[in-house]
Amino acid sequence: MDLKGKCVLLGVSGGIAAYKMANVASALRKLGADVEVIMTRNATQFITPITFETLTGHKCMVDTFDRDFKFEVTHISLAKKADVILVAPATANVIAKMAHGIADDMLTTVVLAAKCPKLVSPAMNTGMLENPITQDNIATLEKYGFTVIPSESGVLACKDVGSGRLPKEDVLLDYIFRAIAKPKDLAGLRIAVTAGPTQEPLDPVRYLTNHSTGKMGYAVARAAAMRGAEVTLIHGPTALQPVRVTEDVPIKTAQQMYEAVTSRFDEMDVLVMAAAVADYRPAAVADDKIKKKDGDLSIAVERTPDILGTIGPKKKGQFLCGFSMETRDMLANSSAKLEKKNLDMVVANNLKVAGAGFGVDTNVVTFITPDGARELPLMSKDDVADAILDEILKRRK
């Protein structure tokens, strides 16, 4: 993903976290964004404008009446140029001004004039943040369409422990991506995505599982959320960074996955079953650790619930997309799955094809639909995710 052709305006106010915004500005430039920065006068006490000028290649604006600038009505030109505004750190003072339409410096004037998406990241002492006045002002910003990024908790600069920390750089970047990186062509759709492996316990120590990392399912959930959908992510244990979705549902077993999906299915418009759900589980789970003994150990297994096999015949207009990982006869097996489970689409791949296995950041997939098969080239899983959503959107119309 990149931000080429997009202008991101950073508004930096006078909090101790102001210095952290240098890394954000640098990261945005590396992603191809055109970055403009406006600082309040108090912010210049924590980090100098020249730092941002060096990182962005633009003059850092502070003074509303700066004469050493090209002849334009600056607060209007910047407001029109920006595709998104991020005010971070947003102090209690700046939040109060924005909430009440006060425009007494360059930053608040531009924010008031701008019509683009506006993101606000409060960062301050816990007592200031939790003060009812500040909370009312934050609620006012949300009422007027601002997106408020929740503060993180931890040890603050004042040594207090509590909420009020500026979120990490990747969180701020994620909010920017959500605002402008992709068209909101999935707005209004409720999409459930499953991801990752399941774990079927054998005893208190061991379980049966597979090699799935959840990368493909997480990529679909992330892309759907960025494109405006209300996303429910139902996932097995993974080591991946959490995805910001409408509802996050962690599970462990296939039975838990079955219950999580079936209980929500009636409310969904689309289900993308990207999880690698176990087909079998131990028929009995030992209460204590199974001890090593001479000779072999035989484990009786039983079938787990067939999620798509259950909901496919019962669907009422929902779009069902299954996944099929094969090692041979991929097209035949995946086509049979499409028909047997009453699916609208199957995303098939062959584990033996280079770049299509577990744990990698790429995939080689074939879309199986009632119209036939369409093979895609080697792509990143992020690009595959968008291709899947494009196909779903096209076929729902």
Please give the residue ranges for each predicted region:
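A cross-family phosphate/adenosyl-ligand binding-site feature
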Residues: M1-L119, N125-K397
